[in-house]
């Protein structure tokens, strides 16, 4: 089972916010997930990001691959350094 850390879309049309979730890579974007580790609201000024650092590091240590967007959010929050 390939596990990914990715965004799950919520909100109204043209007003999205996202939950950062750990999911099987074969699951649909807004489908089943294994664990929720935070949220991202790009509409707020400034953009609002909240991530449970402990859970994020745990999932990264067991091999979960972050999506490109989540990777950039992790860099912004200082969770990964690349």
UniProtKB/Swiss-Prot annotation:
Keywords: Ribonucleoprotein, Ribosomal protein. InterPro entries: Ribosomal_bS16 (IPR000307), Ribosomal_bS16_CS (IPR020592), Ribosomal_bS16_dom_sf (IPR023803). It comes from the Bacteria. Transmembrane segments: none annotated. GO terms for cellular component: cytoplasm; small ribosomal subunit. One of its GO terms (biological process) is translation. GO terms for molecular function: structural constituent of ribosome. SUPFAM superfamilies: Ribosomal protein S16. The keyword Ribonucleoprotein applies. Belongs to the bacterial ribosomal protein bS16 family. This is Small ribosomal subunit protein bS16. The lineage of its organism: Bacteria, Bacillati, Bacillota, Clostridia, Thermoanaerobacterales. The gene is rpsP.
